[in-house]
Design a protein with these regions (language model features):
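Gram-negative and organellar
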Residues: 24-412
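Cleavable N-terminal export/targeting peptides
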Residues: 1-40
């Protein structure tokens, strides 16, 4: 009798551990932002859409408005090169943007919505003085049954400044563009140890200028994960993905098969990681057949007053340079939010890329891209805060930009 009870308790423990991992996947247990935004102009950091999916948002409605002033030393370099090489010049600017977040739900359904937008005015920009931007983020999870979880993630942004956190877009200033990433997935627990996750992701990139039109494309990714709970804190994963990339006009269409394996592991209640490795087999109009190793990892550490997210990947990426074919690239990103004191907090967003035809030219060319943005926020009152920071970008040593800013934010 005792042995039977112990066996039942062990079975329940394994089942609970497995269900907790599923909850973490749909973002129901850890508080945090749905996505990160740039404090100087309110534009979203696209890479945070996936990394922040483990977070949940406080229920209710939150509104905020920010007014920022700053100086950008290379605002007029439309070609993306440095000030000295292309005649680009600096400009004082001011930004005014607002954001709204709303979270609601039931025990079976959870919905989080965040949206925002604003305008940046450059005093010394000859033609385009006003620079509008806006974004929308939506996260929805629904459990039709105890075994099944349906998830939907929607992200779309309209902006003109390049977003170097992902490879969906140029690393040069090519005018206003729309970037969208939408994912729907179905997770089903067949047994207490075995589950599957079926997903579809649509990525869309559309520039409104003729200079950026060769980057316009749609990316369709179909995925199937087979998950097995090896231990209460570790799940083994076998994964297959099929990707179709369809360019609007450039002859760079491709199809790719991904054969991957990896682990999802909880090191401690505060530290968890995901790891994938394997091979990608690509057939493209420009390069023919390519076989390349693939690696992807993400570590999330929940601090007492914040969090750290570190991501890494090595894969074949679409080029950031107009009209240039794809090539392997290494990409790493670090996001840090930390409360230094009761009133003072610090943020850091760091992204680095090596390879991927960033410097243009032939398919073998490569370069280094770095994007770093530290900032501080000081809570003056419960609703009013001051922020200041610095944003630096450099692409292949030929393009650099320094952005200094400070402002006030009011939430209600």
């Amino acid at each position: 009798m005792i042995a039977r009870k112990l066996g039942l308790l062990c079975f329940i423990g394994v089942a609970l551990a497995f269900s907790q991992q599923l909850c973490a996947q749909v973002g129901e247990t850890i508080p945090g932002p749905l996505l990160e935004t740039r404090p100087e102009n309110g534009t979203p950091i696209a890479a945070s859409v996936q990394t922040n999916s483990i977070f949940s948002q406080p229920r209710g409605l939150t509104l905020s408005n920010s007014v920022v002033g700053g100086y950008n030393d290379n605002v007029n370099a439309s070609t993306g090169a440095s000030t000295s090489s292309t005649g680009g010049s600096g400009s004082l600017y001011t930004s005014d943007y607002a954001s709204l977040s709303y979270t609601f739900g039931t025990p079976r359904t959870h919905v989080s919505l965040t949206t925002g937008g604003g305008v940046t005015y450059y005093f010394d920009r000859p033609e385009e003085g006003y620079n509008p931007a806006g974004y929308l983020g939506l996260s929805l999870t629904h459990k039709p049954s105890e075994r099944m979880t349906l998830s939907l993630s929607v992200f779309a942004s309209y902006q003109s400044q390049p977003d170097l956190s992902t490879n969906l877009g140029s690393n040069q200033q090519l005018g206003s563009f729309i970037h969208s990433t939408d994912t729907i997935s179905l997770a089903y627990s067949w047994t207490p140890r075995f589950s599957t996750v079926t997903s579809y992701t649509l990525d869309l990139l559309n520039y409104f200028s003729s200079a950026g039109s060769l980057q316009n494309r749609m990316e369709h990714t179909f995925g199937e994960q087979f998950r097995y709970l090896l231990w209460p804190t570790t799940a083994g994963v076998a994964e297959y993905r099929y990707e179709i990339i369809d360019y609007e006009s450039a002859p760079l269409d491709s199809t790719t098969h991904f054969l991957l394996a990896g682990l999802d592991h909880t090191f401690t209640p505060r530290l968890n990681g995901t790891f994938r490795g394997g091979v990608e087999l690509r057939s493209s109009e420009s390069n023919g057949f390519q076989a390349s190793p693939y690696f992807q990892s993400a570590l999330t550490y929940i601090l007492h007053n914040g969090f750290v997210i570190w991501t890494n990947s090595y894969s074949i990426e679409e080029s950031n340079t107009v009209g240039v074919s794809s090539a392997p690239a290494f990409r790493t990103g670090l996001t840090l939010n930390y409360g230094l004191t009761r009133r003072l907090s610090g943020n850091l967003a760091l992204f680095y890329v090596y390879g991927g035809n960033q410097s243009g030219g032939t398919s073998s060319s490569s370069g280094n891209t770095i994007d770093i943005s530290p900032s501080l926020r000081y809570l003056i009152t419960r609703r009013l805060s001051a922020n200041a920071g610095y944003h630096y970008t450099s692409v292949s040593g030929s393009q650099s930009q320094n952005n200094y800013f400070a402002g006030l934010s009011f939430s209600f």
